[in-house]
A protein has these predicted regions:
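Asp-based phosphoryl-transfer active-site loop
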Residues: 21-34
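Active-site phosphate-binding/coordination module
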Residues: 35-139
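Single conserved hydrophobic/aromatic residue that forms the stacking wall/gate
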Residues: 264-267, 271-272
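Short, Lys/Arg-enriched N-terminal segments with co-localized hydrophobic residues
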Residues: 6-16
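Conserved acidic, metal-coordinating active-site core of Asp-based
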Residues: 112, 116-231, 235-238, 252
Length: 272
């Protein structure tokens, strides 16, 4: 019976891959399980996708350095969508699409965060650099352990730091982050502000989105919108799930995400 089930699943996968010509996947909570690992079943399916010549593109709020090891593990040779669409790099990690925050806005924002709550960890991402005041600070050290990237210490008084900011990440206790979000949304309506989880507040240009970055790569791959598959689990995945020909929400997806998807899978722990 198990052999029959496996054959049926393989036929189903083959039929799907005939229809869809590019796959875009979020990383945390989608591709990776709670141990920040790729389930073996998922790994096998992605390697088969690669063998079929179908681009498998990682899409994340992460910086490029936080994604390259995962791409290498999957043996994928595709561009990557970073900072939730604010930066796209090609197969050689060269920037091919960039949407940065205005310098004055980024500088004013970061200074305002410290005024509102000095306990908040402020992290600036510019191209493939992660800038912090203190890399030994609790939240920065924890993020470094998760992503495998070591931040660079700089003075936030230096205006050059804000020259090409793709993302600002604020980390802290969930109560502090909730209060910060509420205040910043009022004061900075011209930029995109959202919580990727209770303790993380992501901030970037209003012009940056995962769906816009996918739209650009659609032309790069010479595929149609209806030939695109997208997998996600969180609020910042909603626009790409809606955009894709087949949008899939993971079983662990937020309740607000599942209704916008065509279908949803069982929890990401299983690798399905």
């Amino acid at each position: 019976m198990e052999e029959i089930d496996n054959k049926a699943e393989k036929r189903k996968d083959a039929d799907i891959m005939k229809k869809y010509k590019a796959v875009f996947s979020d990383i945390d909570g989608t591709l990776l399980n709670s141990k920040h690992q790729i389930p073996e079943n998922t790994r096998k399916k992605i390697k088969q996708i690669n063998k079929n010549g179908i681009p498998y593109v990682l899409v994340s709020a992460r910086m490029p350095k936080g994604m390259t090891a995962i791409r290498a593990e999957l043996e994928a040779k595709s561009p990557m969508i970073c900072y939730s669409g604010a930066l796209v790099v090609d197969e050689e990690d060269h920037p091919i699409y960039s949407v940065a925050m205005p310098q004055e806005v980024a500088m004013k924002l970061c200074r305002r965060v410290y005024e509102l709550n000095p306990k908040i960890s402020v992290n600036i991402y510019t191209n493939d650099e992660w800038l912090v005041k203190d890399k030994k600070e609790y939240w920065a050290a924890q993020e470094s352990d998760i992503t495998g990237v070591i931040p660079q210490e700089v003075s936030f008084e230096d205006e050059e730091v804000y020259k090409e900011v793709h993302k600002v990440l604020c980390m802290g206790d969930k109560e502090d982050i909730a209060a910060l979000e509420q205040q910043l949304v009022k004061e900075f309506p011209q930029i995109r502000i959202y919580r990727s989880k209770d303790t993380y507040l992501e901030i970037m240009s209003m012009k940056a989105s995962k769906s816009d970055a996918i739209h650009m790569l659609k032309d790069h791959f010479h595929v149609k919108q209806e030939e695109i598959m997208a997998f996600g689990d969180n609020f910042n995945d909603i626009d790409m799930i809606r955009y894709a020909g087949l949008g899939v929400a993971m079983g662990n997806a937020a309740d607000e995400v599942k209704p916008v998807s065509y279908t949803h899978l069982r929890a990401h722990e299983t690798g399905a």
